[in-house]
C-alpha cells in the first residue's frame, strides 16, 4: 500500500469518547451522533425501564434491564468526508476502570453537560483523567428545550471548576418553551430550532447576519435584542477559539443544543471533525510510535466476555496505533513474544459485529480471545516494544465473595479471574487464608459480577462484609527486603488476578504505618498492565 493512501486513511479518522455525569443525556447524544452520521435510521430514544425500546449502544442484558450503559461500546460511522470512531463509556453512577482505560484509547473527548445543572461530580472526575494526557475536549451544553441556567454562568463554572478556557461557538436564543435556536458565532448565522424526535432530522431555517430584520420577525424583537446584547458581552468577555490551545487540552469549544430534539448535535460534530486531531501516536518504553509509521501496532484497552451469548466468546478491543490491519496478517503479542495469524478481527456498531478486511490507525478492532490476551497487551507486526500508560487502579470498595454451593469453587475462581482480566473488577486471594476478595471502583460493579457469574458461569455467589479499606501493589528493587516483607506481613498480603503481590490494609492508618515501617517497599495505587 502506498504511503499516500495510508496517510489519507489516517487523516480521515477521528476517535473520541463521550464523557458526562449520569443523566446529562450522554446515551441520547450517542444515539443522535449516530443518527446524524446516518449509522442509525431510528435513534432509539433512551426510554425508562418499562419500555421495550432500548438504546442502540446499551446491549448487555444488565444494561437493557436497567436502562444504563455498563460497558464500553464501540461504534464507527462516516460523517462529512471523515470516519468517526465513537467509544461510549458507562454513564451510570458507578464507573469502572473500563471508563478510565477507554480514555487512553481516544484522541479527543466530547463533554456533555446538562445545562439545567452545570458541572457535576462525575464530569469533574472524568476531566481529571483526560488531564493525564491533555486530551482535547469539545463541550455540548444539552437540554436547551428545558429551562436552563444562565449560559454565561455555565461557561464561568466550566472555566473555574474544570480549569479549562471556554470558547463559545454557538449561543442559545431563549430556552425551555421559548427556545428558538442558536446563533453560530463563526458563521454569523442564526439556526432556528425545529424539534425533531426519534429519527426525524428537521430541515432548519438559517438567517444570515445578526442585524437581519428577519431575525426579529422569526424569534421576536425582545429575544433578538437580548441575543445582540448577550453576544456583545460574550465577544468582550469570553475567549476566541484557538486551535493550538484546544489541541493542548487548555481550551474547549462550546456548543448549545438539545440532543432529544435532534438540534445542535450536527454543529458540534462539524466542529469535532474539523478541529479534533487525527489519530495520534502513543508512547512505548523506547519512544513514541507515530500513527503514520507504516508498520502495524496496537494495544488492548478492554476485554469483554460473552458479548454474544450464542458464541460464548471473549473479545479483546484493540486500538490501532499505527499502520494498517489486513485480514490474515500476522501479529506479535509483545508480552508473550508469540506471533498469531488474525483473519477474523471484528468491527462494531454497538453489538452488531462484522468481519473486517482492513482497518487503520485510530480504528478499534475486536480480536477473539481464548484466554491468552490481557488488558494492556501490545500487538505489532513483529517488533517487541510495549505501549505504556494503560493503567490498573487500586479499587476503593471491597467485599468477600462466597458460594452458595461450595462444590463450585473452581468455576467461581475461573469466572472471577476472567472478569478481572476484563477489568470489570479485581480479585484478591489473601496469602493467609482461602478467602476471595472482590475489589471495585464503584458499587454497581459488585452487582454486575454476581449477575454475570450466574448467567455465564452458572455460579450462585453472594457477598459478605470484609475488613479492607484499601489495597496497594507492592514492589521493591531489593529482593531480600521484599522476601522479609512477605514473611512478616503475610496477614495483609494477597495476590491479584495476575498474581501480583498486593498489600490489603484494614485501615488507612494501617497502610501509613506499613509504609513507614518498610521504607524500601513501594506501595502504589496504580499498576501498568
Curated annotation (Swiss-Prot):
GTP binds at residues 20-27, 88-92, 142-145. It comes from the Bacteria. InterPro entries: EF-G-like_DII, EFG_III/V, G_TR_CS, P-loop_NTPase, PrfC, RF3_C, RF3_dom_3_sf, RF3_GTP-bd. Its main location: cytoplasm. GO terms for biological process: regulation of translational termination. Keywords: Cytoplasm, GTP-binding, Nucleotide-binding, Protein biosynthesis. PROSITE patterns: G_TR_1, G_TR_2. The keyword 4Fe-4S does not apply. NCBIfam families: prfC, PRK00741.1, small_GTP. Increases the formation of ribosomal termination complexes and stimulates activities of RF-1 and RF-2. It binds guanine nucleotides and has strong preference for UGA stop codons. It may interact directly with the ribosome. The stimulation of RF-1 and RF-2 is significantly reduced by GTP and GDP, but not by GMP. Belongs to the TRAFAC class translation factor GTPase superfamily. Classic translation factor GTPase family. PrfC subfamily. This is Peptide chain release factor 3. It comes from Alteromonas mediterranea (strain DSM 17117 / CIP 110805 / LMG 28347 / Deep ecotype). The lineage of its organism: Bacteria, Pseudomonadati, Pseudomonadota, Gammaproteobacteria, Alteromonadales. The gene is prfC.
